[in-house]
């Protein structure tokens, strides 16, 4: 991260000090826009560059006529580098010394006297578990009624999204600079981020190509990933997806997967499910060719001529589901494994290895079973977990959750983090739709990593559109109905 900061400054002909002034200025403009009525600020500054951004914000606040108190960790004389320059400029305007941060949490100071608290304590500089006094400060801030804005990342978090424990600032707004940090996009600490603003600080595009990132960010402004459809195309041009699932009582999951494949643009969609679900499936989606199978051996004929298999939604883990999965995984076409298919693979009764490409879409619990670890282990390092699972299973992985991570089964491939999605997606059936959508894009001849990444992004963006209308009442069917429009823009 620091290397990227230096290269950004160099590319723009700026000193590190000038880049810090630019970052602090952007932060002050952002807080002024979000909290225009804020007249009294408390800025918490560490002794590093994150604190330097804070000194810039504090100086600009004073120059704008706001009341602003600065609280600093340690002795201000220990501040060095560009942060020292920023501190000196603040001191020249303030005419006073900063207060020790311990004073902020004394009985003589009321936190709620401030309209806004700015966190410039550590940022990306946190490389170890916070000291006990830091944890005490965070606990006190948690009781404050004033909103908190964090600069770069909420202090206490690990920037790369790796293992992070202990206390961390819970911000209402985080403003990060030059490039997003993984911890701001994925993982169990997203509630600490609040609203997120990413300001590139005018960093040239060429600068990003000089640095090897830890991950790629998947965002809705990216386009041109899907091939343009020929005017003389026919249904065979876009592949035939076979969805297998829906054991007794679980037909809805398989039907949602089939719906995802339909709206994902597959030329043909077939569904193999229990006989008891056939009538309901045909009534809901007459476009789907539905076949009731009680004997899994009937799948062998159904597999002929299919371009992609999606298996797992509502599959169950008894003999019927296990046998269906064994047959499906013997084929050489791409197979998308979701839900119970993943659980069966994790249990060891079925091997995922096969002649064709495989895509697995585990949620954290399923990922933990695949990896033989705890859910906490998976969530503590989502990037690393997805990469390790991809290599272990020789499959493309979509590790679902807040900030879904997509990883390819090659050691040098960068994981991809989805920047979209919302809490309304935390409902049964969302993953089934995603599995069908991935299958549809595979059927259109996309490579597994591209098909999975595009599907994850489109699925999340469609859900964001539905969230604006439905809120907590969001359903997987709402997402299905918006997929076609989203994919048209990809």
PLM feature segments, named:
Residues 1-73, 80, 184-339, 343-359, ...:
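Small-residue (G/A/S/T)-rich helix-start motifs and N-terminal tracts that mark the onset
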Residues 58-143, 279-292, 298-305:
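N-terminal small/polar loop signature for handling phosphorylated ligands or for N-terminal nucleophile
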Residues 82, 133, 167-170, 429, ...:
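Short acidic-hydrophobic sequence patches enriched in Asp/Glu that either
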Residues 115-116, 121-212:
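Internal gly/pro-rich beta-alpha loop/helix module
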């Amino acid at each position: 991260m620091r290397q990227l900061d230096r290269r950004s400054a160099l590319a723009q002909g700026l000193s590190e000090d000038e880049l810090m002034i630019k970052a602090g200025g952007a932060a002050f403009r952002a807080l002024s826009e979000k909290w225009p009525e804020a007249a009294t600020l408390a800025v918490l500054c560490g002794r590093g560059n994150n604190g330097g951004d804070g000194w810039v914000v504090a100086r600009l606040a004073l120059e704008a006529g706001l009341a602003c108190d600065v609280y600093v960790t340690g002795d201000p004389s220990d501040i060095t580098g560009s942060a020292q320059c920023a501190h000196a400029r603040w001191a020249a305007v303030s005419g006073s010394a900063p207060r020790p941060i311990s004073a902020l949490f004394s009985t003589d100071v009321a936190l709620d006297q401030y309209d806004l608290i700015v966190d410039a304590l550590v940022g990306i500089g946190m490389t170890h578990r916070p000291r006990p006094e830091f944890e005490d400060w965070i606990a006190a801030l948690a009781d404050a009624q004033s909103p908190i804005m964090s600069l770069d990342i909420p202090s206490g978090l690990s920037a790369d999204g790796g293992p992070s424990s202990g206390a961390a600032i819970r911000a209402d707004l985080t403003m990060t600079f030059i490039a997003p940090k993984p911890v701001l996009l994925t993982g169990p600490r997203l509630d600490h981020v609040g609203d997120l603003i990413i300001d590139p600080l005018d960093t040239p595009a060429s600068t990003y190509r000089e640095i090897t990132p830890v991950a790629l960010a998947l965002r809705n402004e990216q386009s041109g990933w899907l091939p343009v459809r020929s005017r003389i195309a026919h249904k065979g041009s876009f592949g035939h997806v076979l969805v297998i699932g829906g054991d007794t009582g679980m037909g809805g999951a398989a039907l949602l997967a089939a719906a995802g494949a339909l709206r994902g643009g597959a030329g043909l969609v077939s569904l193999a499910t229990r006989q008891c679900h056939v009538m309901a499936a045909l009534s809901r989606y007459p476009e789907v060719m539905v076949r009731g199978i009680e004997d899994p051996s009937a799948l062998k004929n159904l597999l002929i001529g299919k371009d992609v298999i999606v298996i797992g939604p509502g599959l169950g883990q008894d003999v019927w589901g296990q046998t269906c999965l064994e047959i499906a995984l013997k084929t050489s076409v791409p197979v998308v494994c979701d839900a119970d298919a993943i659980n069966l693979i994790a249990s060891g009764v079925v091997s995922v290895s096969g002649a064709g490409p495989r895509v697995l879409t585990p949620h954290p619990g399923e990922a933990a079973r695949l990896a033989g670890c705890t859910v906490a282990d998976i969530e503590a390092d989502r990037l690393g977990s997805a990469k390790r699972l991809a290599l272990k299973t020789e499959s493309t992985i979509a590790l679902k959750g807040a900030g879904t991570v997509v990883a390819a089964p090659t050691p040098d491939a960068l994981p991809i983090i989805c920047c979209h999605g919302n809490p309304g997606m935390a409902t049964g059936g969302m993953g089934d739709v995603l599995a069908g959508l991935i299958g549809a894009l595979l059927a259109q001849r996309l490579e597994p990593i591209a098909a999975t990444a595009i599907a994850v992004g489109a699925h999340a963006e469609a859900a964001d559109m539905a969230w604006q209308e439905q809120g907590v009442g969001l359903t997987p069917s709402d997402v299905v109905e918006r997929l076609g429009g989203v994919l048209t823009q990809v």
